[in-house]
Structures are given as structure tokens and as C-alpha cells.
Amino acid sequence: MTAPDPIRAAFEEARATLDAFLADPKNVDAVHRFARAAADTLKRGGLLMSCGNGGSMCDAMHFAEEFTGRFRKDRAALPAIAFSDPSQLTCIANDFGFDEVFARSVEAYGKKGDLLVAITTSGNSPNILRAIEVAKKKGITVVGLLGKGGGKAKELVDVPIVVPRAETSDRIQELHIKVLHIAIEAVERELFPGNYGES
């Protein structure tokens, strides 16, 4: 009997997670709402902000750089920032505590009509919950990229996008980056239709 191939099994598990996500129409609708909120924010001259811990911070940075740089084709730079500056984060953590590292940044940069993408695989990261709290007080729309049922964040954000089925952060993050890329493409298609052969 041939032993199971763990590498193939990992790909199969990733596919099963995506299939579970697509099986619920509410999930695709939430990504539409995310893309619409981001496009509307940019049309108003607002700022896209993002934050996360560990691998989710990498996703937050990836999201922002696709706007300030480009996604697929050259176009005007768009205002987006990930709260990932080491000196800023360590200053805030040292002086105010780690739970405040993103909240202080939202307080500093965010204004009514902006958008915050809050990324947490558990939905319960205290510093993400604090950032959401501050954002809501300022009239900032919050999209949550979440996992494991959505945690506390699910009830706090305007647009919760919860990865189903997955038990581990890596599987959750794999779907988060798909959601981010697809939302970015949707925003580009609206703001720069010529880049996609659309009028």
C-alpha cells in the first residue's frame, strides 16, 4: 500500500478550503462589498489602510503595495498604507503597549470615509480589535479578513470575510491573499478599465 503523499494532501486541503468558501454565496458577495468599498474610498480621495500580525502583516503590506505600485499594468499610484513601520510599531508598543500598535496608527492617519482592512486569522487579536474600535469611532469602514469562525471581530467589522473549514493559519492566509488579489483586480477594473480592455 502506497503511503499518502503529504504534499498532494496539502494541495487538496487548500482546494477544499476554496471550494467551501465558494459554496456559500455570502462569501463572494462579501468580496464584492469589499471591492466596492475600496473603489468608493479611492474615488472620494480617501485612504486605504491595512494591518495584521505576522503573516497577516505580510498580507497587509502586500495589499498596500499593489495600490501604491501596480497590480498588473502601469497606472497612477493610489493611496494605501500598511501599518508596518518597525520604529513606529516598537515606539507605540514600548510607550502604550502592544495592543495599541495599530489603533494609534488608525488614530493618526485615518479619517471619516477611509477604509481599514483588518486581518486576523483568529478574529481575536487584541491589537486588531483595538484598531477596529478606533476606526469605527472615526467613521472608517472596516473590512475584516478572518478565520476560525470570525472571532470577536466578525461582529465589529462592516464587511466580515471569514475563511470556512480551515483549522490552521496557513490555510486561512492562503485564502486571504486570494481575496485581496481579487478585490484589487476588481478595483482596478473599475478605476482603470482601459487596462483590462474595457471601456
Where are these regions (language model features)?
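Glycine-centered short loops/turns at secondary-structure junctions
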Residues: 45-46, 113, 139-140
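Surface-exposed amphipathic alpha-helices with a cationic face
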Residues: 132-136
